Amino acid sequence: MDGILNINKPEGMTSFDVVRKVRFMLKNEKVGHTGTLDPMASGVLPICVGRATKFADYMVESKKIYLAELRLGITTETYDREGSVVNTRGVYLKKKDIIEEILSFQGEIEQVPPMYSALKVNGRRLYELARKGIEIERKKRKITIYSIDIVNIELPYVSFKVTCSKGTYIRSLCNDIGNNLNCGGTMWNLKRLSTGNFNIADSIALEYLDSENILKYIIPIDKALYGYPEVLVEDEYVKKILNGISIKDESFLSKTIKDKLYRVYIEGNKFIGIGMNKDFQFKMVKLFV
């Protein structure tokens, strides 16, 4: 069995907890996730099953949408409510100033990842160092905040919906907003509403899954990759491309755009993987068959 499960992760579970439960239901089938969702966060967590695990990296390139709750007036070590409190301050701000500051983060910005994150530096996870009381300098990374919509303000709490690029840490965003408002801030709640083609409305709660019904919720791998355009390989090229030989025929190359990834199909609408037109030839980047 190969495909994706669109899981609605509950609060309090790690992403690996979800993987382990799914693996148990599928009797130790190869299972993995497409990107960590913090234990205190809930929402969309796509789980790859079987050969779909080979395509996990191609699913994290997409936009993500979160519903976040920011608690102003408090700063914690982890930038969320579960961390030790570092500082507290009174919140004496006008709503219009809060809104203006939050919206100023829209666009391409630079963000410093939190110490409590799964990022690796010199082979070590940052959270492993943080738990030992070690803080190291982290390089700023370019991210994109496509949009922010304020949902509600009941000080000291502010709820907002954010659409962002991969690699965005909402905890860092909340911390930065609090710092700029000179009162501190920490992420209080977080729900991922969507990632790529996976939406919370179409997700399945983990508690409803069991070994009897889980198979009917597995989505074909190519549906998870609908963000990439498709291209059909004619019969005359199928043997070549399946054996790792590039297609150099201009009539085929003209159907694709240089340096762009494609979902590749053969006759019968059979998905065979991801390919790319690079250096005047089309070649498979990742095979599904």
Swiss-Prot record:
UniProt entry keywords in alphabetical sequence: Isomerase, tRNA processing
Q: What is its EC number?
A: 5.4.99.25
Known catalysed reaction(s)? uridine(55) in tRNA = pseudouridine(55) in tRNA
Please list every transmembrane segment annotated in the UniProt record, as residue ranges.
none
Q: Can you tell which superkingdom this protein's organism belongs to?
A: Bacteria
InterPro entries for this protein: PsdUridine_synth_cat_dom_sf, PsdUridine_synth_N, tRNA_psdUridine_synth_TruB, TruB_C
Catalytic machinery residues = D38 (nucleophile)
Q: Which GO terms describe its molecular function?
A: RNA binding; tRNA pseudouridine(55) synthase activity
One Pfam family of this chain: TruB_N
- Asked if the keyword Isomerase belongs to this entry, the reply reads yes
In terms of Gene3D superfamilies, this protein maps to: Pseudouridine synthase
What CDD domains does this protein's entry cite? PseudoU_synth_EcTruB
The Gene Ontology biological process terms listed for this entry are: mRNA pseudouridine synthesis; tRNA pseudouridine synthesis
Q: Is tRNA processing one of the keywords?
A: yes
Q: What does this protein do?
A: Responsible for synthesis of pseudouridine from uracil-55 in the psi GC loop of transfer RNAs.
PANTHER family annotated for this entry?
PSEUDOURIDYLATE SYNTHASE TRUB1, TRNA-PSEUDOURIDINE SYNTHASE
The similarity annotation says: Belongs to the pseudouridine synthase TruB family. Type 1 subfamily.
Q: What's this protein's name?
A: tRNA pseudouridine synthase B
- Organism of provenance: Clostridium kluyveri (strain ATCC 8527 / DSM 555 / NBRC 12016 / NCIMB 10680 / K1)
